[in-house]
C-alpha cells in the first residue's frame, strides 16, 4: 500500500472551470486503504490547484476492490478554485485538513418532522419532507437574507385524447383536452450530506382530481457558498399511450420582484441579446428621450419623481406580462410576448439556436434560469408570466406547451416480424416505464447582471466543467481494463487509427446533418443506411434507432479514454444519458431490460438485457 499518492487532473477544453464539479479518481488494487473513512471524506484527500493552494474537497467511495482497498472515489469541489489543472492526493492518516476545511459543517442547519432547513452561506431555503410536502420541491429561497423565490414546483400538462362526443375536438374527430397536473411528492431522501455538496431526491407522481399519472424523480444539488441550485429532472412514462399525450413538462419558480413594473426586467441569452421589461419606457407623449429607454434596459438607478413624465408615461403604456422563448426545432427558436391571456401573442424575435437561459429581475434582484442542451433536446422553452406583479412565475420547460403534444404511440398496430426484422409476431411496442432526464439551473441574483454574465451562465449550464486524468495515466493504471493508446508506428496501425478517427467524425457530422435531436431522440444514432433513398432506414424496425446495438457506447467511451477529446465526451455522454433512460424500462412488466433497435425507441417485441446492461455506462459513472 502506497501513501500520499497524487493524481493529476485537467479540465477538458471548451469547458469553463467555474461552478461546482464532481469528478472521479481511480486507485490500483491494494494501493489505497483509508482507515475510518468518514462519510464526507473531508480529511481523506487533499486537492490543490496550480498555485499549490489547498481547495476543500468532499469525497465518497464509489467502488472497492475485493481486498477492501479503494478502487474508485468521487470528489466534489469548486472548479473556479481548481482552475485548469489540479492535483488530488490521498491521505492515509486522517485529520490533516486545512483551517478552511476544518470550519466547514453540514448545510442542513435544522430538521423536524416536516421540513429540512438549509443554509449554504449564501442561500437559505426549506425543503418539505412530511405530510405538508404536497407539490413543492423547495420553498422560501433567500439570498443573503432577502426572499427571492417563494417556491419551486414540478409542472405537467397532459393532452388527453379520446373518441367520446365532446365540444373539444380536432379535425380527426378526437376529443382533445389539456389538463394541468400538480406534483404529488411521495418521498424525499437525502442522498449526500456534506459541507460542500448536498443532494436531495424527491420522488412522486403527478395528480389531477385524485388521478395519478406519470412519475418523476428530481434531484436538487446545493453547494457551499453558491447562489445556484441545480435540478436534475427525470420523467417516467406511467400512463396510457393511446390517450395521454405530453403537452408540457418543467419546473416553475414563483419569484419575488421588487420595484415598479418598468423595473421588472426580462432577458434571454442568445445569438443576439434580447432585453426588455414589463413596461417599456418608449413614449411619444409625454415624449421620453431614447436615453431613458437605454437607462431602463441597462438597469440603472431610477429616482424619478411621482409627477415626472416617466411616471405619467408608464401609467399609460402596454404592460407586457408574459414573455416566452420557444425552441421548436434544432434550427429555430421564437420569442413571443403578450399583455393578457385574452390577447394575441406578438412575435418579438426569431433565431436559430437559443442559448437556453433567461434572467428575470426586479429593482433589487431576481433569478437566472438555464436549461442544459436547450436546442439539442427541443421542444424546450423558458417563460415568465405576471412579470409586472410582485410575484412572477418563471418556468423552465423541458417540453414546451407551445409545441404540438408528444405522441407515445407506435407507428402501426402490428409487428412486421420478417420484412422489417422486428423480432416476434406479437405487438411489443410500449412506452410504459421508459424515462428521460433534463437539467435546469437556478441562479439567484441581487441585481440585474452585466450583459455578458447571462451568456456566461448559459455556457456553464450547457458545458459544465469535466475533470479527468490523461489517457496515458488511465492506461498505465489499467482503469476500465485492458485497452490501447493510439499507435501509428506501422502502416496497419496508422490505417486503423485513421479509420477510428474518421468513424467518429462521420457520426458526429451525421448527428448534425440528419438532425438527430429532440427530447426523446438526442444521444442516439441510426443503425443502417439506405443507399437507394440516400437516408437512414428510419422507418424499418430492425434498422432504425441504434439503441446500443453493436455497443456504440463501449466504442465511444473507449475512444474517449484513448484520446481525451472533449467532443467525444459530449457525444458519449449524450448517448449514455439517452440509452440508460429512453431505451430502458425502469418499472412495469419489462422492468430491467431494454428495447433493441427500432423505429420508436420503445418499439417492437425485442426486449433484451444486453440493451440495459450497466457496462454501457460505467465509464461515465465513475469519471463523473
Region annotations inferred by a language model:
Residues 31-54, 138, 252-268:
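Solvent-exposed beta-hairpin/edge-strand motifs
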Residues 46-73, 407-419:
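Solvent-exposed beta-strand/loop surfaces of large extracellular or lumenal domains
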Residues 148-150, 154-155, 165, 177-184, ...:
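Catalytic cores of eukaryotic secretory-pathway lumenal/extracellular enzymes that build
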Residues 89-113:
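Carboxylate-rich, divalent-cation-coordinating active-site regions
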Residues 72-95:
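Intrinsically disordered, low-complexity Pro/Gly/Ser/Thr-rich segments with frequent PxxP/GP/PP motifs
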Residues 2-19, 232-236:
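Short beta-strand elements of extracellular/lumenal beta-sandwich folds
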Residues 75, 115-474, 522, 526-528, ...:
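Beta-strand/loop-rich accessory regions of lumenal/periplasmic or secreted enzymes
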Residues 12-43, 246-254:
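Surface-exposed beta-strand/loop patches in extracellular or lumenal glycoproteins
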Amino acid at each position: 500500500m502506497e501513501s500520499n499518492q497524487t493524481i493529476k487532473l485537467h479540465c477538458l477544453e471548451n469547458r469553463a472551470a467555474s461552478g461546482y464539479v464532481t469528478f472521479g479518481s481511480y486507485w490500483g488494487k491494494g494501493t489505497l486503504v483509508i482507515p475510518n473513512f468518514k462519510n464526507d471524506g473531508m480529511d481523506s484527500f487533499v486537492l490543490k490547484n496550480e498555485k499549490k493552494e489547498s481547495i476543500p474537497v468532499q469525497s465518497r467511495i464509489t467502488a472497492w476492490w475485493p481486498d477492501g482497498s479503494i478502487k474508485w472515489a468521487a470528489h466534489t469541489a469548486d472548479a473556479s478554485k481548481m482552475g485548469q489543472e489540479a492535483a488530488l492526493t490521498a491521505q492515509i492518516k486522517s485529520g490533516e485538513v486545512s483551517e478552511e476545511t476544518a470550519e466547514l459543517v453540514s448545510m442542513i442547519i435544522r430538521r423536524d418532522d416536516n421540513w429540512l432547513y438549509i443554509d449554504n452561506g449564501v442561500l437559505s431555503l426549506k425543503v418539505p419532507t412530511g405530510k405538508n410536502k404536497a407539490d413543492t420541491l423547495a420553498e422560501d429561497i433567500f439570498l443573503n437574507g432577502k426572499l427571492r423565490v417563494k417556491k419551486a414546483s414540478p409542472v405537467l400538462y397532459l393532452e388527453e385524447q379520446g373518441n367520446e362526443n365532446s365540444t373539444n375536438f380536432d379535425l380527426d374527430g378526437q376529443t382533445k383536452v389539456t389538463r394541468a397536473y400538480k406534483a404529488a411528492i411521495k418521498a424525499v431522501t437525502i442522498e449526500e450530506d456534506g459541507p460542500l455538496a448536498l443532494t436531495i431526491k424527491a420522488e412522486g407522481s403527478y395528480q389531477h382530481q385524485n388521478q395519478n399519472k406519470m412519475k418523476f424523480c428530481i434531484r436538487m444539488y446545493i453547494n457551499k457558498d453558491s447562489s445556484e441550485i441545480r435540478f436534475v429532472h427525470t420523467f417516467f412514462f406511467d400512463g396510457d399511450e393511446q390517450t395521454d399525450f405530453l403537452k408540457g413538462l418543467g419546473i416553475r419558480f414563483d419569484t419575488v420582484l421588487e420595484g415598479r413594473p418598468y423595473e421588472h426586467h426580462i432577458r434571454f441569452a442568445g445569438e443576439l441579446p434580447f432585453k426588455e421589461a414589463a413596461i417599456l419606457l418608449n413614449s411619444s407623449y409625454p415624449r421620453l428621450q431614447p436615453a431613458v429607454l437605454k437607462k431602463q434596459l441597462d438597469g440603472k438607478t431610477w429616482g424619478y419623481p411621482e409627477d415626472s413624465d416617466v411616471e405619467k408615461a408608464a401609467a399609460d403604456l402596454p404592460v407586457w406580462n408574459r414573455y416566452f422563448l420557444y425552441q421548436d426545432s434544432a434550427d429555430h427558436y421564437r420569442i413571443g410576448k403578450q399583455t393578457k391571456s385574452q390577447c394575441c401573442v406578438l412575435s418579438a424575435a426569431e433565431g436559430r439556436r437559443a442559448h437556453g437561459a433567461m434572467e428575470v429581475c426586479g429593482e433589487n434582484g431576481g433569478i437566472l434560469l438555464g436549461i442544459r442542451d436547450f436546442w439539442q433536446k427541443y421542444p424546450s422553452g423558458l417563460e415568465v408570466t405576471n412579470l409586472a406583479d410582485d410575484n412572477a412565475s418563471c418556468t423552465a420547460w423541458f417540453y414546451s406547451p407551445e409545441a404540438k403534444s408528444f405522441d407515445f404511440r407506435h407507428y402501426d398496430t402490428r409487428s412486421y416480424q420478417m420484412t422489417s426484422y422486428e423480432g416476434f409476431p406479437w405487438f411489443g411496442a410500449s412506452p410504459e416505464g421508459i424515462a428521460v432526464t433534463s437539467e435546469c439551473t437556478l441562479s439567484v441574483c441581487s441585481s440585474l447582471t452585466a450583459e455578458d454574465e447571462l451568456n456566461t451562465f448559459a455556457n456553464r449550464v450547457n458545458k459544465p466543467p469535466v475533470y479527468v486524468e490523461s489517457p496515458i495515466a488511465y492506461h498505465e493504471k489499467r482503469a476500465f481494463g485492458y485497452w490501447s493508446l493510439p499507435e501509428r508506428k506501422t502502416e496497419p496501425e496508422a490505417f486503423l487509427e485513421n479509420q477510428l478517427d474518421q468513424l467518429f467524425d462521420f457520426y458526429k457530422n451525421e448527428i448534425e446533418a440528419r438532425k438527430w435531436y429532440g427530447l426523446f431522440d438526442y444521444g442516439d444514432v441510426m443503425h443502417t443506411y439506405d443507399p437507394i433513398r440516400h437516408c437512414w432506414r428510419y422507418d424499418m424496425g430492425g434498422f432504425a434507432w441504434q439503441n446500443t446495438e453493436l455497443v456504440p457506447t463501449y466504442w465511444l467511451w473507449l475512444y474517449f479514454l484513448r484520446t481525451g477529446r472533449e467532443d467525444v465526451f459530449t457525444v458519449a455522454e449524450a448517448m449514455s444519458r439517452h440509452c440508460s433512460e429512453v431505451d430502458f424500462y425502469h418499472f412495469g412488466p419489462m422492468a430491467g431490460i431494454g428495447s433493441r433497435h427500432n423505429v420508436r425507441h420503445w418499439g417492437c417485441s425485442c426486449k433484451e438485457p444486453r440493451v440495459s446492461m450497466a457496462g454501457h455506462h460505467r465509464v461515465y459513472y465513475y469519471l463523473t
